[in-house]
């Protein structure tokens, strides 16, 4: 939801009033409790279909806990009215495993909140690409390898998942181009000691 001057409204520096409120509140919860975030990271589901060697949340045990769509959907308009401008769906599991992720994206968009994802990309299927990609500002895919064998070792999954992710990226990129979407599609990788 950038403005006409291409100033990214999601950066804290563009919200001096909110910064002032935070500084004034200090450690006083009564003053701080009405200062809301500009950006949120939400984990729609606790389950993950990979067991990455670098995972920082593996300690939670990958419980298959999902956000309840109805309750979360009711909160989205409230969040927007309180100043939340963007939500990144990522977190403690693979966000695209949520059975109603496309409905979550639609409800988030309808509330006027910008949407982004961090995903391993295995579940980024045609339905997600066609229904959610047009409503999303950016998607970051965790590829983390250049070969299927290395990918399988790092992600603790089958080698075929690497090819599936690469195919999904290609499909998303073609769909973006064919439909004139502005959604940024990127990959992340990392360096690990051998």
PLM feature spans:
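A general structural signal marking secondary-structure boundaries and capping sites
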Residues: 59, 158, 173-176
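Conserved phosphate-donor/acceptor-positioning beta-strand/loop module used by diverse small-molecule
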Residues: 141-143
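Residue-level recognition of short, structured coil/turn motifs
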Residues: 49, 156, 177-180
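Surface-exposed cleft-lining segments at the edges of enzyme active sites
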Residues: 153-158, 187-191
């Amino acid at each position: 939801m950038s403005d006409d001057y291409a100033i990214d409204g999601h950066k804290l520096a563009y919200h001096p009033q909110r910064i002032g409120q935070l500084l004034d509140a200090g450690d006083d919860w009564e003053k701080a409790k009405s200062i809301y975030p500009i950006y949120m990271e939400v984990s729609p589901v606790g389950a993950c279909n990979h067991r990455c060697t670098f995972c920082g949340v593996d300690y939670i045990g990958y419980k298959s806990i999902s956000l309840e769509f109805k309750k979360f959907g009711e909160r989205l308009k409230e969040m927007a009215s309180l100043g939340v401008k963007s939500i990144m769906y990522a977190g403690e599991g693979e966000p695209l495993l949520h059975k109603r992720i496309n409905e979550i994206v639609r409800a988030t968009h309808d509330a006027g909140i910008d949407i982004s994802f961090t995903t391993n990309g295995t579940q980024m299927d045609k339905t997600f690409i066609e229904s959610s990609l047009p409503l999303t500002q950016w998607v970051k895919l965790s590829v983390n390898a250049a070969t299927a064998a290395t990918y399988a070792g790092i992600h603790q999954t089958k080698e075929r998942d690497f090819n599936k992710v690469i195919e999904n990226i290609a499909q998303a990129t073609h769909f973006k181009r064919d439909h004139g979407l502005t959604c940024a599609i990127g990959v992340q990788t990392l360096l690990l000691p051998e």
